[in-house]
């Protein structure tokens, strides 16, 4: 009888710990195609207003554009084989001298910290979409096909991990879903 009571108590305690631990990590998934959704990345009207008040995350847009346009990833963020950022490597390289990889500017992180946690991913998606349009307008004649897709993919991959880099509580990544085959995020 004592063994059963102990087993039930231990199971309940474990269940409580697992439930409590999962409350502190929230991932907001943005999975609608902007082309079929008239609200674009802003399914929540409050997020559209925050995006406009934050001046469309201007500092983040500038940084995303700069990182996406790095030729061959030369001095941009380093990537692991599974497409993840290797941020630890970036931090080490920042301390090694003049050829350092720039972290997101503090102003970009400040913009993200001012967002409601629920709106971080939708506003980042809006900023990424603006950068995508800017790249297409500026580079449309020089870049075609796969090269353009790679640049646009880098925009979204970089934006995906910005919440983690900027230490945004309750949001570690923004899992932007691919809506078309291939490496691009559209």
Swiss-Prot record:
Residues 22-38, 77-97 form a propeptide. Residues 1-21 form the signal peptide. The keyword Disulfide bond applies. SUPFAM superfamilies: Bifunctional inhibitor/lipid-transfer protein/seed storage 2S albumin (SSF47699). One of its GO terms (molecular function) is nutrient reservoir activity. InterPro entries: Bifun_inhib/LTP/seed_sf, Bifunc_inhib/LTP/seed_store, Napin/2SS/CON. It comes from the Eukaryota. It holds the Pfam family Tryp_alpha_amyl. The keyword Disulfide bond applies. Keywords: Disulfide bond, Seed storage protein, Signal, Storage protein. Cotyledons and the axis. The small, basic, water-soluble napins are one of the two major kinds of storage proteins synthesized in the seed during its maturation. Belongs to the 2S seed storage albumins family. This is Napin embryo-specific. The lineage of its organism: Eukaryota, Viridiplantae, Streptophyta, Embryophyta, Tracheophyta.
């Amino acid at each position: 009888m004592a063994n059963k009571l102990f087993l039930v108590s231990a199971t309940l305690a474990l269940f409580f710990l697992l439930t409590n631990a999962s409350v502190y990590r929230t991932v907001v998934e943005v999975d609608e195609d902007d082309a079929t959704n008239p609200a674009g990345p802003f399914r929540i009207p409050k997020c559209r207003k925050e995006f406009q008040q934050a001046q469309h995350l201007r500092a983040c847009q500038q940084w995303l554009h700069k990182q996406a346009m790095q030729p061959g990833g030369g001095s941009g963020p380093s990537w692991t084989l599974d497409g993840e950022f290797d941020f630890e490597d970036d931090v080490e390289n920042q301390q090694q001298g003049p050829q350092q990889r720039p972290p997101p500017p503090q102003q970009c992180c400040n913009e993200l910290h001012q967002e409601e946690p629920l709106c971080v991913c939708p506003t980042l998606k809006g900023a990424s979409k603006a950068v995508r349009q800017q790249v297409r307008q500026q580079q449309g004649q020089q870049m075609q096909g796969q090269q353009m897709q790679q640049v646009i993919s880098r925009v979204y991959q970089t934006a995906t991990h910005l919440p983690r880099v900027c230490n945004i509580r309750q949001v570690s990544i923004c899992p932007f879903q691919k809506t078309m085959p291939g490496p691009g995020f559209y």
